Swiss-Prot record:
Biased composition (Gly residues): 1-24, 139-219
Region (Disordered): 1-29, 120-219
Classification lineage: Eukaryota, Fungi, Dikarya, Ascomycota, Saccharomycotina
Complex formation: Component of the small nucleolar ribonucleoprotein particles containing H/ACA-type snoRNAs (H/ACA snoRNPs).
Organism: Kluyveromyces lactis (strain ATCC 8585 / CBS 2359 / DSM 70799 / NBRC 1267 / NRRL Y-1140 / WM37)
Protein name: H/ACA ribonucleoprotein complex subunit GAR1
One example GO MF annotation: box H/ACA snoRNA binding
Annotated segments matching region RGG-box 2: 143-212
Cross-referenced PANTHER family: H_ACA RIBONUCLEOPROTEIN COMPLEX SUBUNIT 1, NUCLEOLAR PROTEIN FAMILY A MEMBER 1 SNORNP PROTEIN GAR1
Amino acid sequence: MSFRGGNRGSRGGFRGNSRGGFGGRAAPQGPPDSVLEMGAFLHPCEGDIVCRSINTKIPYFNAPIYLENKTQVGKVDEILGPLNEVFFTVKCSDGVKAESFSEGDKFYIAPDKLLPIERFLPKPKVAGPPKPKRKRSGAPGGRGGFGGGRGGARGGSRGGFGGGRGGSRGGFGGSRGGFSGGRGGFSGGSRGGSRGGSRGGFGGSRGGSRGGFGGGRRF
């Protein structure tokens, strides 16, 4: 991740902080009591000075930049590059031309206009206490039990009911079987004895009974 991206994100914060903290339109202050080396001139760019940082700290945005004799030449405008190789640009003050400097010329800054580079590094994550695990035996178990109940109820009741149906149908079938057996017995008896007998000796009786039964049906 380039320092430019990180700085542009923090630039809003720094600009807001520096302008708010230092007043923005406050009366201009005189040169600082002391200055530190901040950067070395690389080349001009669209009227601005491009410098390579030679300080281990990061300058404030809009921080005044001086010569060694504490003459102000401009203010920090942009900060560029990765954290291990920082560059910055200087917006020149009125009457100062970027083309008037040579490569290697040094620029200075007040000590109170610097930030430690640690401010721009990601903070390590602090491991907190482990979160207690929720016991999942309550509700899901209840649902499982309820499901078992449903399974038991459905299986038992339907199974029992099905058995009942099977039993009743079986019984009914038995009854039908018994009835059929009865019919078989009756049929066998009647056909064996009665029917044979009727054909032999009760032929008139059969005709009479059928005639009588037919008469009964007419009523």
